[in-house]
C-alpha cells in the first residue's frame, strides 16, 4: 500500500532516495557549531534544573518561538509553483516590455494560487474567489500580475476594500463567520452583483488550481517603443479545461482532504503532468475608451469579447514544485506596482489602491527588505538605487556607493528612455460617487445568456442556501438587488428563501428542563 502513494505523500522517502549513499550532514546550531546531543537538555544532575549555558536548547527554542510570521490578511491559504512564460505571438506593436520581446522568448515565472477569505489552514474547496498571481522575472525587473480566477471583482472603489474584507472574515465578538456581515455589505453595495453571481455559479468552486482560468482583472496600459499607448486586459485560460466541484463533493473534500488543491498541483508537477495556460490580451485604444458605453476602468465589469477580442500572446507553463514551502511560497510577495517599461497602470481605482496596499503589507509581513528574499529578488536585473539599511538587509547593502541623489560620483543614473507614458488629466478633484454606475446590465447578460437553465437553477439554490442564514431584512435587500437584474432571478431566490424560512421554526432547537414545577406559568411558556 505504501509503495503506491503519490509524490506528495512520499516526499520524505523521495528526499532520502535523492541523497543516495550520502552520509547524513553534521547536526549544528544556527551558528554552525556541531551538536553532540540533541535529545537531552543539560541539567545539574539527572533531576536538577536546566542550565543557562545549554546553548543547544536556547538556540533551538529561541528560534522556534519566532518561526511564525504574520499571516496574509487575505489570500492566506495558497499553493505555489515555478515555470516559464513563452511568447508565441508578436505583440511588440502594443508593448515594448522585454517579456514580449520576440516569439520563442522564455521568461522564468513564479505562480501562487490561493483562496481569499480563509485562514492559512482553511480548506481549498470552499466557495471563494481564487487568487492567481504570476511573477515574471524579466531583465527590466519583476512584473507582478496579481490576478484572480474571475475577470471582475466585488467593488470598484479601493476605499471600500478593508470593509469588504472585514465583512468576509470573522465577527469581531463571536469570531465566527457571519452571514449577516457578508450579505449586509453585498446588499448595500449592488456593484457586487456581478461577482456574487459568478461566485455562486458552478465556477465558484474550481476543481483544484489547474482547471481554472486566470485574469489580470484590472485595466492596464501598454506602451510600445514609439511611445504609443493602448489600454489592455490580461487573460490566461487553462489548457487543462475548466472543471468545477459540485457542492456535495466540495463539502466532502473539505473534511477528507482540505489541502486538495495544493496536493493536486504538487502531484501533477511531480509526475511530469505540467499544467499550462494560454495567455491573451484585450486591447482598447484611447479613443475607444472615450466613447465606451461605461467606464472602461470599472473592475466590476468586463470588456465584451465581440467588441474587444482576445489576442493570443503566449503560454504559462509550471514545471517545478517549491523546494521549501516557507522559503518559496509563504515568503513570496506579489506587488502590482512592479511593472517594467512597456506596462503601466490605468486610472482603475482598485488598481491604484493596490499599488500602495500590496507593498505596504509586504513590508509589514516580511520586512522593508522583502525584495532581497530570493523568491522575490529581481535576479535577472541589477538592482541599483539609494535605498539602504533596514531590518534583514541580507545583501552587501550596495557597498560603498553613494546613498544620495543627485551626486557627482558615477552612481546609478536615471534613464529618460523609460519615462512613463504621459497622459492628460484635468478634471475637478473631489470624491466621486460611483455606486450606481449600471450595476445590472452585464449581470443580466450573465444570468440570461451565459448560464443555461440548469446553471441558473443551481446559482439560485447556492445563493439562497447561503443567504437564508442572514436576517430577514437583509434577505429582502439582497432579493431586491437580484430582482433589479431580472425579475426571474429575484423570484427564484425568494421562493427558495420562503421554503427555508418556513422550515426554521420546525428546525429550532428547544431546551427542556426536567424540574420546572417551581417556574411561573409565563416562564414555563417560554421553555
Swiss-Prot record:
- What ranges does the record list as Basic and acidic residues composition bias? 1-22
Example GO molecular function: enzyme binding
Q: Which residues carry this modification: N6-acetyllysine?
A: 233, 449, 480, 499
Q: Name one Pfam family in it.
A: Catalase-rel
Q: List the disulfide bonds.
A: none
What GO terms in the biological process aspect are recorded for it?
A: aerobic respiration; cellular detoxification of hydrogen peroxide; cholesterol metabolic process; hemoglobin metabolic process; hydrogen peroxide catabolic process; negative regulation of apoptotic process; positive regulation of cell division; positive regulation of phosphatidylinositol 3-kinase/protein kinase B signal transduction
Identify which top EC class this enzyme belongs to. oxidoreductase
Q: Which residues carry this modification: Phosphoserine?
A: 9, 422, 434, 517
Keyword Metal-binding on entry? yes
GO cellular component annotations of the record: catalase complex; cytoplasm; mitochondrion; peroxisomal matrix; peroxisomal membrane; peroxisome
Ligand binding (NADP(+)): 194, 201, 203, 213, 237, 303, 305
Keyword ATP-binding assigned: no
- At the top level, the lineage of the source is Eukaryota
Q: Which InterPro entries match?
A: Catalase, Catalase_3, Catalase_AS, Catalase_clade1/3, Catalase_core, Catalase_haem_BS, Catalase_immune_responsive, Catalase_sf
- Record PTM Phosphothreonine, positions in chain: 511
Ranges in coiled-coil conformation: none
Which positions are catalytic residues?
Answer: 75, 148
Binding sites annotated in the UniProt record for heme: 358
User: What is its biological role?
Assistant: Catalyzes the degradation of hydrogen peroxide (H(2)O(2)) generated by peroxisomal oxidases to water and oxygen, thereby protecting cells from the toxic effects of hydrogen peroxide. Promotes growth of cells including T-cells, B-cells, myeloid leukemia cells, melanoma cells, mastocytoma cells and normal and transformed fibroblast cells.
Q: How does it assemble?
A: Homotetramer. Interacts (via microbody targeting signal) with PEX5, monomeric form interacts with PEX5, leading to its translocation into peroxisomes.
Q: What is this protein called?
A: Catalase
Lineage runs:
Eukaryota, Metazoa, Chordata, Craniata, Vertebrata
* Gene, per the UniProt record: CAT
